[in-house]
Amino acid sequence: GFFSDTVYAQKKKEKRKPPKAKRTQTMSKKVGAEFIKAQEALGEDLPDRAFDILNNLLRRDDLRPFEQAQIIRLQAYVFAEKENYDKALDYLERVFSLNALQPQDQLDLQFQIAQLYLATDKWNEGHEQLLRWFKNAEEMGFPPGPSAHALLAQIYLYFASETERDSPEEKQYYRKAEPHAEKAVLSAAEPRENWYQVYLSILLFDDRYEEAVPILEAMVYRFPDKKNYYRQLAALYAELKREDDSFHIQQIMFSKDMLEKHDELLRIAQLYLFYEVPYKAALILEKELESGRIKDEEKNWEQLANAWLSAREWKKAIPPLKKAAEMSEDGELFLRLGQTFMQEENWKEAEEYIKYAIKKGDLDNPGRAWLLLGITRNKKGIKYENSALFAFKRSTGYEDMEADARRWVKVIESKQARREADRIAAEAAEAELADDSIYFN
């Protein structure tokens, strides 16, 4: 149907003097019986039969204006049900011109006519009719309700959309729409979704983000399954530097499985990293990389490894770091893999990956790679000291690592010199003992 029970405000104003009311009328027995048959046919989804019954009634010479108005109004309803709004409009205008209904019914009819103008894209006529209805409703003591204000706001937004962007005319229509959109949302017990949308669009048109936030918060509460409202609210919070609130909304979206795209899932994982919850970030990245919703790319596997490393889960960082390293064109990630094995004190694996990193090349700091290789070999034990020394000496060839590398060279050479001195001293002692033995034989 056309009509809404929120066309009028719930609390009616004290009535001004209305037009002279017509006596309450009823149909004659014969006309009423046929009229009921037409209604029953409509109820049985037989609109053509209903229309024929009504047409036959209109052929009667003894119809009173009230009966004629009711019959034509029901015919208009038949056309509206068939979505033939042009015809429905013609018939309702005929009823309105008869002026045979009660004043309240005439007022309702005027609103329906305004709605049908809009349904047939006759925006100017609909606007004019609605303004007349507003005036008549106020005069009769029936202040317009939320749905009427929402409709008028929508008309002004339509007019705004037909003007040049950023023009004075566009702004003027938004100004006209605002009080009506505000009344629709704030005066209704349960505002409709599109009323919120209209009011929100007006506030966002002027970048009035502070005012838009409570509206979006209400929309999220009223329509908890609408992803777009959460997304807009998170964006508004971020715009207003309310990053914690923005993150909270995105957490809710994730818990509701509203984040499905690569960028969305990556962003929430990065937010968990930013808020120092790396374990949660790693779980998201791991799950979504395996599902394919986060792309199988080097940087994403590296990010997963970083998350595990930040969570101090060294072993869990190794598989994604290997994947990322294998996809990489340089040796940088193999070097990081070697460092991860160093954290685990797995010196054998650490040495292998650092060597491979140096071999693959294109490192940001090759001198540091040689230094780490030296440390790893040194940790493997005394028999790897010479190869460690070789690595440290290679590291001294890089200016930024020279001082550190020389310290390591000095440490190892000192240890070796000390051992050599100890060896010589031990040999000398043995020789001395051998010489002394002649006196005891």
Predicted regions and their residues:
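TPR/TPR-like (Sel1-like) alpha-helical repeat modules
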Residues: 173-179, 221-222, 238, 254-258, ...
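Structural motif corresponding to the intra-repeat A-B loop/turn of tetratricopeptide repeats
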Residues: 44, 82, 120, 159-160, ...
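Generic helix N-cap/helix-start motif at coil->alpha-helix transitions
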Residues: 27-36, 65-72, 102-112, 141-152, ...
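N-terminal leader/linker segments that initiate helical-solenoid repeat arrays
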Residues: 1-93, 100-108, 119, 128, ...
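Alpha-helical adaptor scaffolds
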Residues: 298-312, 319-368
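Solenoid-like repeat scaffolds
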Residues: 20-26, 58-64, 96-102, 132-141, ...
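Residue at a conserved register position within TPR or TPR-like alpha-solenoid repeats
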Residues: 41, 79, 117, 156, ...
